[in-house]
Each structure stands twice: as structure tokens, then as C-alpha cells.
Amino acid sequence: MLENQDELGLTDDALRREVAFFLLAGAHTTATAFVRAIDHIIGWLETHPEDADLIASDRLFVQRCIHETLRLNPSSPIGRRRALAPVRLRSGIDIPEGAVVVIDLQQVNRDPVVFGDDAGEFNPRRPLPPGVAPFGLSFAAGMHVCIGQDLAAGVVPTPGTSPDDHLSGLLTGSVQQVLNIGVRRDPVNPPERDKNTARPYWGRYPVLFGKEA
């Protein structure tokens, strides 16, 4: 950005905001998704213990768990855009030039018409309609898609994908590694939500490692 600051017409204030955003997008979002994935998978295994071997050995299944976590918990619950020109949506709604459009990503990702009657629940075995991303719109789409999507969540596998040469993402590898060394909730020190925000963040998530005595 510094090399092209003049060409792009970026002010110093715009540069500062972009740098701050990169720190948020590149670290905070991944750390938050990491804890949420651990929580969802631990909860899933409590009711589906038969999947424990898959968590340990099948990286593609773990990646599916990551995608399901991200679907339920987009880093930002909304997306906001300003219309640069008049546009008519497929539904027939007209959006005038200059209008601010707010997309409720969390509700879109939990639409039962798209994701089934249990759309609000964690289910890594969820069947998906053709053309629907397993993580919904959590990474946005089109020209605004998150540039860190493949790095964090990996490439969406297709039938016949081999885990040996598949980019499964940083979250998949780190979550599987922690689960394989026996991460579990601390029974005497339960996790707590962050009371300083309305968003569903964990404020504390104490864990233990190794098998229970």
C-alpha cells in the first residue's frame, strides 16, 4: 500500500485503518473461530461419539466441522455496502443509487430453506444444495470475497478429493492437532461468554489436555 499510496489516492488515515483491519481480519477472526470450532466439535462428540475416530484421522471431516462452525458464526454478523448505481434484485426489489444495503449474514447462513430445518444447529453431516458454500456467506462472495478464505478455511473439497494433497486451511490443521492431544473443557472452570459485547464471543474458555483420569 505504501508503494502505491499516491497512485491509489490513499490518505494516511485510510492506511492506518487498513492496517488495523488486517490485524483484525488476519488474527482476531481466526482465533475466535478456533475456539468456536473446539466448542462445537466437543459438543458434537458428546452426542455423536462414533465420530471420534473421524476427528482423529479424517482431515476432510475436520474441515467440514470448521466450515459448519464458520457458517453458524460469521466473523461479522452483517455486511454493509453502498449501491454505486441503481439495481433491481431478482426478487424485484429496487435499490436506488447511494442506498446503504445491510446483509444479515448470520440469518442468511441459518436460512432453513437453504440449510434445512436444523439450520441453527451444528451438524457437519449436513447435506448442502448444489452451489451453496458450506460456510454460507461468512467469507462474502464475488469481488468482495475474503482474501484469507483459503488460508484460514482451506479449499472446499469436491468428490474424490484426496486429503494428502488438499489445502485444508490453518484452522483445520490446528483444531485437529489440539483435539488429538485430548483437549476438553475444564469441568470445574466452565467457559464464560464475553459480557462486554452483544456478539457471541467467548470471554474465557478454560481447557484441560489429556484423557480424563
Residue positions per predicted region:
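Short, hydrophobic/aliphatic alpha-helical segments
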Residues: 5-23, 124-143
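Acyl activation and transfer enzymes in specialized metabolism, enriched
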Residues: 25-30, 93, 149, 162-166
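A structural signal for well-ordered alpha-helical segments within the folded catalytic domains
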Residues: 32, 60-63, 133, 137, ...
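Conserved cytochrome P450 K-helix E-x-x-R motif and the immediately C-terminal K′/meander segment
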Residues: 53-93
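Conserved cytochrome P450 K-helix/beta-meander segment immediately N-terminal to the heme-binding cysteine loop
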Residues: 104-131, 139, 144, 151
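Cytochrome P450 heme-binding "Cys pocket" and the immediately downstream C-terminal segment
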Residues: 149-197
